[in-house]
């Protein structure tokens, strides 16, 4: 078996290749906006009162209290960005999230695409769906707008690239956010360009993580450079091999204990991702380390306790993992002690950064 270093150096070579190499065979990129009849477990029953008592951090939002256990067909608007190599789906009505992305050469979903909108009471305001890439801006995740409509705009750029911009206002912090989802006409990768602005005269809470999902399979190996991982409270632990000689970078060796949060640190690198060794496909993320240093892996526990959430969040697409990229090294969590505390967003400050998401194949 290849060493952990050998594995991620090979992934780095692929990232570098994607970053400098362009392909063009004259085929046009295609942008489609369509309404689909989509299998949906809906949500509703809004509390008529804002969140005065149960969670003051999300005031003035209210909470949704009703979640369907019967599936219906409901209209869902999708924005499809497609070139010769990949297809990216965006759903403005569900937090503006990237719903999924597929490598057209082999059908690999390098961003997990859920074939059902199964809303469950997980986010700060309640409704949340698994899969895709969730854009979190504000006080803490999963932010209040992750299950409700955002503004959006689509464009075909003069150079032939495709653009879908999503965004909105986080009412608790009064900050404004935008994400440009760009599919170049001649690359097997897409880009997200984020802009976040604090228009107020006071400090606001600062929390940003881009939460992507991938399929959870026994042959999945994570390429996450580092030699330690941080807990939510800031405690450093060994990575990837723990004191019991379990290689935590192998999904199947996480078959112990509760669900896992690994904030991996200790290497100055711009990329991370994962690879499925049996079918030689995978997924990757690139972002400048000085812009987005956080790299987190979230795994539901591999026992039936995690399987319950698979049943709650999808019908046929199986369990997923999350690979998250963040502006900070570790996610603040209420109740944890220092050194991890809530970061602040200075008055009238604007932050911008760029990330690239791409499929991987045949590098095993």
Predicted region positions:
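Short, hydrophobic/aromatic-enriched beta-strand segments in well-ordered soluble domains
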Residues: 168, 194-196, 349-362
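Active-site-surrounding "flap" and adjacent substrate/cofactor-binding loops of secreted or lumenal enzymes
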Residues: 105-124
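Bacterial Sec-dependent N-terminal signal peptides
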Residues: 1-28
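Extended, loop-rich substrate-binding clefts of extracytoplasmic carbohydrate-active enzymes
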Residues: 47-74, 78-82, 130-188, 218-219, ...
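Short, surface-exposed, low-complexity cationic segments
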Residues: 93-107, 170-172, 360-363
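Core domains of carbohydrate- and sulfate-ester-processing enzymes
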Residues: 124-135, 139, 231-243
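A contiguous, surface-exposed recognition patch within enzymatic or periplasmic domains that forms
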Residues: 35-40, 79-82, 88, 94-100, ...
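Short N-terminal segments immediately surrounding and downstream of signal-peptide cleavage
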Residues: 27-43
